[in-house]
Each structure stands twice: as structure tokens, then as C-alpha cells.
Amino acid sequence: MTLASIFVLYSEAIITKVFLITAGTFGTMAFVGYTTKSDLTSLGKLAFMGLIGIIIATVVNLFIGSSGMDLIISYIGVAVFIGLTAYDAQKIKHMLAMCPDGGEQAQKLALMGALSLYLDFINLFLYLLRIFGRNND
């Protein structure tokens, strides 16, 4: 599903509601990931394994076509991308701390980190949209 198609599939009210929920959740988890003293590496590994599981389950569900399985995948997707948001925020902080001069390497790391967080936000938004959009069909 592309971002343009959501305006055809969902109402403006649902899109707005889900966007606000996503923004709040994303901001909170990015803040937690950035400020926590705990090492989130194990959370990142767990979330990555969950992401692989989501991909496999989605492919299987293409053949099965179960709406219940789709809902379960969506809830797991939300949990995975919440975890990845916190992990990626902490990872960016640690990577940029290793480049105190702020040179070209730091700019490349910042760009890659921004892309990771962008993908976390978009995927979190899409999974939440699938959950909330289902309730209003």
C-alpha cells in the first residue's frame, strides 16, 4: 500500500486520528530510546526477528487470506516498530557520539539514521491504520 492510496481507502478522520496517535507514540519512543541508560541492543535484535516473522507471516497470509491473521500481524507490527523506534534512536545517538568532529562521516550516519526513523514512523502509521481502519469498515 502506498501512502497516496490511504486517502482512497480510509476516511480523513481515521487518517488524522491515526497520524496523531502515531506521532505521539513515535515521539515518546524516540525520546525514551534517546534518553534511556539501558542498552537496547537486545530489544533491537528481538524487534528485527519480529520483523522477519512479520514478513514471513504476511507472505503466508497472502495465500491464506485470513482477516484474523492480518489483525494479529498488524498488532505485532505495531509492537515491532515501537521497539525499533527506541532502538534506532539510541543507535543514532551512539553512532554520532563516535564522530565528535561532525564531519562527512557524521553526516552520512545522520542521514542513515533519519531514514531508519522515517521508515519506523511510516510502518508504525500503516500498521495502526490497518488496525483502526478495520474497526470502521
PLM-predicted stretches and their roles:
Residues 1-137:
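A hydrophobic alpha-helical transmembrane-helix feature that marks the membrane cores
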